Amino acid sequence: MSTKNFRVSDGDWICPDKKCGNVNFARRTSCNRCGREKTTEAKMMKAGGTEIGKTLAEKSRGLFSANDWQCKTCSNVNWARRSECNMCNTPKYAKLEERTGYGGGFNERENVEYIEREESDGEYDEFGRKKKKYRGKAVGPASILKEVEDKESEGEEEDEDEDLSKYKLDEDEDEDDADLSKYNLDASEEEDSNKKKSNRRSRSKSRSSHSRSSSRSSSPSSSRSRSRSRSRSSSSSQSRSRSTSRERSRSRGSKSSSRSHRGSSSPRKRSYSSSSSSPERNRKRSRSRSSSTGDPKKRRTRSRSPERHHRSSSGSSHSGSRSSSKKK
């Protein structure tokens, strides 16, 4: 059997004898070389790749031959002489592994120890825990329980019948019957009554002092209000007098300004009129003087009237014109 024509298919098996190691077809039941029968120890062979064949070799146009094989894991095409894939190192012929479902960890399920446990009918389990069926029930017989209860009751009675002479139980009664003459029990009542009286007196004194202080505080407040009202009235009267004096001074200033305005209105006309000595002018002056010596109210009314002011100005102008004509 030449190596060129040797092809491994699925199901072929290897002889379990290490010296032989012959690869047999899947249909053989015994080794073809040593004659040893096929057993469960015989490992199955698996092809890691398949030959591409003549058709694919022709399509490659001389790049690959018909004996070249294609890897099943990475689909790489390898030469026929390679026993492993050039890309993923998958063997061309590999041993078929048994599918046991194990994870493949260290010593997994190889030497598993199964401890056989027998369920006992005892009260406690192997870990020392009380079983559920015995938790709410009394395990011992009723006679044992009664004996235990009797012993406990006897022990309590013995404790009660012990001598109590060593304990001084009557000391409290002796203390209650002791003489109380050394204690002044009535003094506390008298002190309480005295304290109450002193408190009442202090309260009455504080109230009277409070009323006096309030009356005193009210009297200066009333005097203050009176002084304030007086100061306000005096200030109002002063302000009124000041306003009247200001009005009078203003009226006097306005009168003097009107007089000065009249005197300075026509200086040339006055010069002309002074040169002319007319009897009419003298009469007017005498009339104005007599009016000035009279009542001030009449003088104010005459000075304020615009018609008379206009007449006097026209008269002065006529006198000036007459004097100028005489000079000519």
Swiss-Prot record:
Cellular compartment(s): Nucleus
Entry protein name: Zinc finger Ran-binding domain-containing protein 2
Domain of life: Eukaryota
Gene Ontology CC, one term: nucleus
Subunit structure: Interacts with the C-terminal half of SNRNP70, the Arg/Ser-rich domain of AKAP17A as well as with U2AF1 and CLK1.
Pfam families in alphabetical order: Zn_ribbon_RanBP (PF00641)
Basic residues bias locations: 196-210, 251-271, 297-312
Gene name tied to this protein: ZRANB2
Job description of the protein: Splice factor required for alternative splicing of TRA2B/SFRS10 transcripts. Binds to ssRNA containing the consensus sequence 5'-AGGUAA-3'. May interfere with constitutive 5'-splice site selection.
Keywords: Acetylation, Metal-binding, mRNA processing, mRNA splicing, Nucleus, Phosphoprotein, Repeat, RNA-binding, Zinc, Zinc-finger
Record's comment describing the protein's domains: The RanBP2-type zinc fingers mediate binding to RNA.
Zinc finger intervals, RanBP2-type: 9-40, 65-94
Organism: Sus scrofa
